[in-house]
Amino acid sequence: MQRTLLTFALAVLVVSAPAFAQNQPNPQPNTNGTTREGSVNDRRQDQQGRIANGVQSGQLTAGETKNIEGREANLNREIKDDRSANGGKLTTQERQQVNHQQNNLSRSIYNDKHNANQAHYGNNEVGQRRENQQDRIAQGIRSGQMTAGEAARTENREQGINQQTRADRAANGGRLTGQEKRQINRQQNGASRQIYRQKHNNRVAPK
């Protein structure tokens, strides 16, 4: 009896397999020459999540994030323009081009996160504020409150502060004078306000 039931179950499984396969989504292009947009948008969000993780962990420096997010912003503009020219869709050729660019960006994110460059904050007030601001940027990128362009501009500003801090310390035996600390604090205040404005304006990352 058990053998009969097992044979019957296997027969049902074999018969139902083709029907199950037929019900799965078809990834082929639409008949009008355009392709579904899900994978482009999904990859975009996935890459922003990877960037956010790199920023928060310190694997991506401000300069690296600036460069990557600048490229992401350019790609986003290209996608927007292509869709506007084609009734809100990407053609198959455009999608292939976008996929190629996203592959290049993905490799850059991986390489930057695994190279020798790391964000080092140090156990001091200036370093702790830098780390806090990077965490806020990471949260804004991850949530979509900050666009790629906004993140690139903010990280460009953070990179400038980091370079000045490093130069000031190099000129003073590894320390900052009281005046230099006050100047850096003012710059960090300005960057902090910029982060807040970008996270609370009406611009969000494309979905």
What does each model-identified segment do?
Residues 24-28, 197-207:
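Short, low-complexity, Pro/Ser/Thr/Gly-rich segments in the mature regions of secreted, periplasmic
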Residues 74-89, 104-117, 160-175, 190-203:
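Amphipathic alpha-helical coiled-coil segments
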Residues 7-16:
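Bacterial N-terminal signal peptides
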Residues 23-42:
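N-terminal propeptides/low-complexity segments immediately following signal peptides
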Residues 52-84:
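N-terminal, post-signal-peptide region of Sec/Tat-exported proteins
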Residues 62-70, 91-100, 148-156, 177-186:
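Short, charged, amphipathic alpha-helical segments
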Residues 17-21:
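Sec/Tat signal peptide C-region and signal peptidase I cleavage site
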Residues 108-149, 153-156:
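Extended amphipathic alpha-helical interaction segments
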